[in-house]
Amino acid sequence: MTEPRLKIALTKGRVEQQVLPLLEEAGLDCSQVRNKQRRLIFDSETQPYEFILAKGPDVTTFLERGAADIGIVGSDILTEHESTQYELLDLGVGKCQFVLASTADFDPVAPRRKIIGTKYPLITQRYFDRLGQDVEIIKIEGSVELAPLTGLADAIVDITETGTTIRENHLQIYDYLQPVSTRLVVNRLALKQQQAAIFDLVDRLATVVDTNNPKEFV
């Protein structure tokens, strides 16, 4: 009987580049993905895995609809899209922070209603709800940093790894909302049907993650 393939939806781009070495250290054959050319679906010739390369939001859709068994995607996408699938592992890469940023003259506690530009309206709304502040949120798909510089918004909520882009655009950080990293999530039905194979993969990846991110003992 042929062993069923685990379908792994992997966020293409930077997440893909950071995660492929982890998958390879865990023993997965990723040669087809590395030599992808223009393809987006890859079968391992030697192992029961199939890789699907997709944009982050689409990874969650593949999982929700059962088109993928495992998804590898940023926690920002999972939170913004309110994913209901099981999160099994923090892969320890793609580490960033959600920040509130604006120009030097921005007053974060001013009582007036603020306009906030962001790619993440749900996360932004929840943040200001916790603060008890009423804001207008404008969804921006491109360079969010432009919003306060052009007067489109008073401030922005965005992801930053080092803060360099924010500083280069003459903005400053006023608050840190929450950390972000790349997570491994699993379709609920797949976890029931292929539990042994999924947990075997998760265990191997967890060993790699622990090796690459040793804990500090005080």
Curated annotation (Swiss-Prot):
The keyword Nucleotide-binding applies. Pfam families: HisG (PF01634). Transmembrane segments: none annotated. One of its GO terms (cellular component) is cytoplasm. Its EC number is 2.4.2.17. It is found in: Cytoplasm. Keywords: Amino-acid biosynthesis, ATP-binding, Cytoplasm, Glycosyltransferase, Histidine biosynthesis, Nucleotide-binding, Transferase. PROSITE patterns: ATP_P_PHORIBOSYLTR. It comes from the Bacteria. The keyword Cytoplasm applies. One of its GO terms (biological process) is L-histidine biosynthetic process. Pathway: Amino-acid biosynthesis; L-histidine biosynthesis; L-histidine from 5-phospho-alpha-D-ribose 1-diphosphate: step 1/9. GO terms for molecular function: ATP binding; ATP phosphoribosyltransferase activity. It catalyses: 1-(5-phospho-beta-D-ribosyl)-ATP + diphosphate = 5-phospho-alpha-D-ribose 1-diphosphate + ATP. Lacks the C-terminal regulatory region which is replaced by HisZ. Catalyzes the condensation of ATP and 5-phosphoribose 1-diphosphate to form N'-(5'-phosphoribosyl)-ATP (PR-ATP). Has a crucial role in the pathway because the rate of histidine biosynthesis seems to be controlled primarily by regulation of HisG enzymatic activity. HAMAP family: HisG_Short (MF_01018). Belongs to the ATP phosphoribosyltransferase family. Short subfamily. Heteromultimer composed of HisG and HisZ subunits. NCBIfam families: hisG. This is ATP phosphoribosyltransferase. It comes from Lactiplantibacillus plantarum (strain ATCC BAA-793 / NCIMB 8826 / WCFS1) (Lactobacillus plantarum).
